[in-house]
């Protein structure tokens, strides 16, 4: 049995994450989704709380048909200890999937198998781009699973993102 870990900030969870997780699910029997920087929220780059991100992810993956654990992981700002922190906060896992060079290095040095999944449509599917679209009142809904649209609407995330970004001046006509 293979239990795999995939860590991301998921600000918000989008179709790129969804594609990668579905690819991982073809190789693993159980999945652990680690919500990185769980302590961050209500910031332009991190508008959603860990709990809101849990709702997005569990809603989007309800049809995965695999055991799934969604675990918030707070930053500890001591990279040398971070892998131990992650291990303490998650069920035991056999491998990690990541495209983040620091995460790859830290887990590799800890002797854990690290696989780098191919990014999916990275040019259009990034949390930054989706947050910018929301902030600028442009269509964004097609870039995230329907469950994520529902959560963002339910928590009034659109107005939160716009308020957090109101002073950046990057949106024409705003």
UniProtKB/Swiss-Prot annotation:
<keyword id="KW-0547">Nucleotide-binding</keyword>
<dbReference type="GO" id="GO:0005524">
    <property type="term" value="F:ATP binding"/>
</dbReference>
<dbReference type="GO" id="GO:0005737">
    <property type="term" value="C:cytoplasm"/>
</dbReference>
<keyword id="KW-0520">NAD</keyword>
<keyword id="KW-0808">Transferase</keyword>
<protein>
    <recommendedName>
        <fullName>Nicotinamide-nucleotide adenylyltransferase</fullName>
        <ecNumber>2.7.7.1</ecNumber>
    </recommendedName>
</protein>
<dbReference type="InterPro" id="IPR004821">
    <property type="entry name" value="Cyt_trans-like"/>
</dbReference>
<keyword id="KW-0662">Pyridine nucleotide biosynthesis</keyword>
<dbReference type="Pfam" id="PF01467">
    <property type="entry name" value="CTP_transf_like"/>
</dbReference>
<keyword id="KW-0067">ATP-binding</keyword>
<comment type="pathway">
    <text>Cofactor biosynthesis; NAD(+) biosynthesis; NAD(+) from nicotinamide D-ribonucleotide: step 1/1.</text>
</comment>
<dbReference type="InterPro" id="IPR014729">
    <property type="entry name" value="Rossmann-like_a/b/a_fold"/>
</dbReference>
<dbReference type="InterPro" id="IPR006418">
    <property type="entry name" value="NMN_Atrans_arc"/>
</dbReference>
<comment type="similarity">
    <text>Belongs to the archaeal NMN adenylyltransferase family.</text>
</comment>
<keyword id="KW-0548">Nucleotidyltransferase</keyword>
<keyword id="KW-0963">Cytoplasm</keyword>
<dbReference type="GO" id="GO:0000309">
    <property type="term" value="F:nicotinamide-nucleotide adenylyltransferase activity"/>
</dbReference>
<dbReference type="GO" id="GO:0009435">
    <property type="term" value="P:NAD biosynthetic process"/>
</dbReference>
């Amino acid at each position: 049995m293979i239990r795999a870990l995939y860590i991301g900030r998921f600000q918000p969870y989008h179709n790129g994450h969804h594609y990668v997780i579905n690819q991982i699910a073809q190789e693993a029997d159980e999945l652990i989704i680690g919500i990185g920087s769980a302590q961050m929220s209500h910031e332009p780059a991190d508008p959603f709380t860990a709990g809101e991100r849990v709702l997005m992810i569990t809603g989007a993956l309800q049809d995965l048909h695999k055991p799934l654990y969604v675990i918030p992981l707070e930053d500890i700002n001591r990279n040398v200890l971070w892998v131990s922190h992650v291990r303490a906060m998650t069920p035991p896992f056999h491998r990690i999937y990541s495209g983040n060079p620091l995460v790859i290095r830290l887990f590799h040095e800890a002797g854990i198998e690290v696989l780098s999944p191919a990014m999916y449509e990275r040019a259009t599917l990034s949390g930054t781009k989706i947050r910018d679209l929301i902030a600028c009142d442009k269509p964004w809904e097609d870039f995230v699973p329907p469950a994520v649209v529902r959560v963002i609407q339910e928590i009034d995330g659109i107005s939160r993102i716009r308020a957090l970004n109101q002073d950046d001046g990057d949106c024409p006509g705003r």
